[in-house]
Amino acid sequence: MEDEDRLYRLNGIAHVAGYIEEEPSRVITAVRRQQNMPLHDRIIPYLETASLYHLARLNSQWFWVDESLLSAFIERWRPETHTFHMPFGECTITLQDVAYQLGLPIDGAPVSGCLTEFENLMEHGRPAWVWFRELFGELPPQSKVKQMTVCYTWFHERFRVLPAYATDETVRVYTRAYILMLLSSQLFADKNANRVHLRWLPYLASLDDLGRYSWGSAALAWLYRCLCRGTNRNVVNLAGPLQLLQSWIFWRFPTLRPTGFDRFGFPLASRWAEFVPRNDAGAQRLVSARLALDRLRVHDFVWEPYSSTDVAAVIHPEILADEHRRLWTAVTSLIYFAAIEWHQVDRVLPQFGGVQHLPDGALNIDWLHTKDGRGGDRWFPTYYQEWHQLWKNRLQCSISGSEADCVD
């Protein structure tokens, strides 16, 4: 069959699902990094203010991921709909899942701005390395710097242990390092696994304002983007918040979850903190996982895993606040700097206790999938103004109300 006749397309490159017979054993390699910095009591108040404390608690242990299982799910991911296409229908990871699994806030300002040209593109911006010195008190040696990134090892060596009698300002410096590493490893890891990008400097400059951002929607935007990239048959590495993806699978697909993990707390992803998958026979396990997905029926998927009394008993109430809950069913944009994705929950209404109607056609955002911030820095709230406006109007786009004004 000629490439032009392939059913699975992604920006001109065929979807891996269309090549299973030719390449039956592509197992994605998970690109991940552990933050691995102790959480000091004096840093915790800043994390609570930033709404990142629950994520920091997840950071205390390394989360292993089953690469063969994730690879089988990627084969069923459709970039057009941001859903997994299963034998029983569509399902996906939503903002509700992010809240329960990672304990992140959903409502808030988008995580956006520019990447490096702070002095040129933002009000009160500073040259990147000048700002870095102001925030961290020093510059890393040139051997630890590559363009606008710094080696993880430098932060580990310099800021891993807070001095016993640190001043308040020293605590703030170490807090910036902790949060920078936390965001770069747990939520927004990319394929450059050994380096930290300077895009976070404007956020770290104002620790007291970090709580006003929608970390949950940004994390989901980045996971969607990484999954969409992963469907490209030529891609072999997968980054992003993979502990979210794997925990979502285990919570919603009981036949695929490991045994012996019945106890759980909050955030719900902590349930699998001690899970260690097999690391051998990856191709064979991929085939087994693929067959398991082929045999799934509607009763094999837990549509509402968070409605149980056991879950209600451990949930922290702040994630259930109205301003966050209302967005779980919003059909809206998801923003993480240059990565813009679409929250298409109108296709998975049973995950919210609803009855699935025939959904509208998928929103064509193929051109957005070609944008990743390379090719020149920009002020993304202006460059992607339409999509930022959609997030600004997010409360008007809940499927519990009218969808007519959400998408033209």
Question: What role is predicted for each listed range?
Answer:
Residues M1-D408:
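Structural stabilizers in ordered domains
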